[in-house]
Amino acid sequence: MTLPGGPTGMARPGGARPCSPGLERAPRRSVGELRLLFEARCAAVAAAAAAGEPRARGAKRRGGQVPNGLPRAPPAPVIPQLTVTAEEPDVPPTSPGPPERERDCLPAAGSSHLQQPRRLSTSSVSSTGSSSLLEDSEDDLLSDSESRSRGNVQLEAGEDVGQKNHWQKIRTMVNLPVISPFKKRYAWVQLAGHTGSFKAAGTSGLILKRCSEPERYCLARLMADALRGCVPAFHGVVERDGESYLQLQDLLDGFDGPCVLDCKMGVRTYLEEELTKARERPKLRKDMYKKMLAVDPEAPTEEEHAQRAVTKPRYMQWREGISSSTTLGFRIEGIKKADGSCSTDFKTTRSREQVLRVFEEFVQGDEEVLRRYLNRLQQIRDTLEVSEFFRRHEVIGSSLLFVHDHCHRAGVWLIDFGKTTPLPDGQILDHRRPWEEGNREDGYLLGLDNLIGILASLAER
């Protein structure tokens, strides 16, 4: 069964209905287009200023008094300033359409988006996960270092300058669509990933993620599989600054102040071959020992205390044991709320009731969002059960990404395929059988069954 191109309530590529009748979204522009608008506007403003200078000088007396009978000139306005960083080239693929707006979603009465300082970025960026390598920490979270990526645009309140140098200070007065800033909106992209994995694409609706060959392999095959509508659209590989990046669909595009939850699926987050390599060439990790100690000082063994270090498989097995991974087949990695605050304090969230309370807090009583999440998860499960890709791959370290906003839009996607591995010819997985070393079962469907059951229980309350 092939899913539609997006979650329940999401429009197909090609455009979306406006949030409210008569309220149309301004088109997004690239940095190059913004610069052309900027130069044209500055030229027009400079010409107008030059033409108006004689009248302004003739209208004033010595001492700055305005003659009787002449209208007093209004004070110099506060002009927005536009700061454009280095431009990235446009990327040709067309981005998918934003989610469909099912209900009106207007600003609060009396508010004006023009009164607030604004920031613009040439591209929205979404979390499509990040593959974790054996020598990398599982918990390198919440990095916003990519906020300094090239191709960002910032619109801020300008200075109140005098008439003499007013036109020298102006940067632009171009009317531009407002897009959330990279740093504020996308600090959560590292909820379960690694620092520096993401980059602004320079095209709205797309994100660049540092390329790994296993993930490129998986995404290319997923685009031809029944699961295509359940994963971020893949638009190939591009080069930036000498590095290769995957060009992916921005899963936040079209959401207004999105809330995001990352749920890591499966009963384990390490490959069987990682266990083998770790036994053959064990490497001690002091950083993981410290993380273990911070959660439970009694968790390390006497030998680990003496070494003040643990191996990564040991840490990951311990972490999965204290979370819901081993018991429910999934665990909550992190949540980003609409106000931008992030939380990853879910390491010991283990029972069904604890998980239910987390989701209850996440949806904030929005029954429509909960219904959409539940329907989407059921669609994903139906598709996984008929997917040839899924039957023939060990899916490790992958997540389900939940996204919704205050307009009742909601979506769920499978993300992060850096550790998804093809099985030997002829072997298939059930994805529900218990894992024993050697059978390569990952427990993905076991976790999805439990997740659907928990959300169904929440919907009945």
Swiss-Prot record:
Q: What is its EC number?
A: 2.7.1.127
Which terms are listed as keywords in the entry?
A: ATP-binding, Calmodulin-binding, Cytoplasm, Cytoskeleton, Kinase, Methylation, Nucleotide-binding, Phosphoprotein, Transferase
Q: Where is this region: Disordered?
A: 1-29, 49-160
Q: What is this protein called?
A: Inositol-trisphosphate 3-kinase A
Q: PTM Phosphoserine: at which residues?
A: S137, S197
Relate the protein's function as given in its record: Catalyzes the phosphorylation of 1D-myo-inositol 1,4,5-trisphosphate (InsP3) into 1D-myo-inositol 1,3,4,5-tetrakisphosphate and participates to the regulation of calcium homeostasis.
What GO molecular functions are on record for this protein? ATP binding; calcium/calmodulin-dependent protein kinase activity; calmodulin binding; inositol hexakisphosphate kinase activity; inositol-1,4,5-trisphosphate 3-kinase activity; small GTPase binding
- Matching Gene3D superfamilies, A to Z? Inositol polyphosphate kinase (3.30.470.160)
Q: Which GO terms describe its biological process?
A: actin cytoskeleton organization; cellular response to calcium ion; dendritic spine maintenance; inositol metabolic process; inositol phosphate biosynthetic process; modification of postsynaptic actin cytoskeleton; phosphatidylinositol phosphate biosynthetic process; positive regulation of dendritic spine morphogenesis
User: Which residues of the sequence carry a binding annotation for ATP?
Assistant: S197, K209, Q249, D250, L251, D262, K336, D416
Ways its activity is controlled: Activated by calcium/calmodulin.
Give the top-rank taxon of the lineage listed in the UniProt record for this protein: Eukaryota
Q: Which residues bind substrate?
A: K264, R285, K312, P313, R314, Y315, M316, Q317, W318, R319, K419
The PTM Omega-N-methylarginine maps to R35, R55, R62
Query: SUPFAM superfamilies per the record?
Result: SAICAR synthase-like
What protein family is recorded?
A: Belongs to the inositol phosphokinase (IPK) family.
Residue spans of biased composition, Low complexity class: 118-134
